[in-house]
Amino acid sequence: MTRRHALLLAAPALQAQRLTPVEELVNTFEMEQMAQRKLSPDLFKEIAGSNRTAFDRITFRPRMMVNTLELDLTTELFGERHFAPILVAPLANPSRYHSDGETAIQQGAAAAKATVIGPPNATTPWVQVETAIPPAAKVLFLTAPFEQAALKKLRAATKLPIVVKGILTPAAAKQAIANGVNGIVISNYRQPETSSIEVLPAIAAEVNNEVPLLIDGSFRRGSDILKALALGAKAVLIGRPVLWGLAAYGARGVQQVLEQLQSELARDMAMCGLRTCAQATPQYVKIHRR
């Protein structure tokens, strides 16, 4: 065996040795670094990066002299009570980043008491969606683009709540509600030049609590999540950080990411004088314009 061959065989073990113990990581940015050590450059490139500019322009306006010894992070969506307004986003092909894939995500999320939105099935044509609904499904999550006629047909075919992802304008949100959707995910899906949290206030004002608003897009800290709650979101979907945790540590990494975000959210709520997520309103934040 040549020296080069021996080094190549040892490379995965050497990489694993460079990973910091998962319990010592303090935020999702460090988890991203661990994922980079674990994955090939091409694989890591698929899930790397974020756009933090919009979050940096939002600051908190805390309330003082409020007793926050007892915090309640729970939130209710579509008749179900959730431990925190932090959900695992639909993630396609997680086994690309870890051999345990979806199983590890489910295990890690369960340990963190977090809800997982099932993986997307992008190969199902719209005309077949109504016949492809799993019997155990509680909510249908659909990703734009879609035709209004198809959405109306699906609405007539099922009594399940329908949530659409990919809404970025107040007009699109109102149109979706008119077509019978029960929830909206504000998402810059395939439109990276637009920040989800930047359009959240206008959509929240237009929707006016007719349906719950969920949101995704570069959420990396508990403070990011609290900003979204204050601006009108009911919950936040976490995608890439979950994949970072999965890639680096499997189920334990997924658990760590979600529990870190939950802990950060609780801390930031207490610092702002908030006892429940429902108390977060626009009065608790300030948006600094460009």
State each model region's role.
Residues 1-12:
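N-terminal secretory signal peptides and thylakoid transit peptides that target proteins
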Residues 19-82, 278-281, 286-290:
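An N-cap/entry alpha-helix motif that binds or orients negatively charged groups
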Residues 40, 88, 109, 154, ...:
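Conserved, mostly hydrophobic/aromatic
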Residues 83-121:
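Glycine-rich active-site/cofactor-binding loop and its immediate structural neighborhood
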Residues 111-130, 135-141:
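A gly/proline- and charged-residue-enriched helix-loop-helix capping module
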Residues 131, 144-215, 226-227, 231-234, ...:
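Alpha/beta enzyme core
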Residues 202, 247-265:
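C-terminal helical cap(s) of enzyme catalytic domains, especially alpha/beta-barrels
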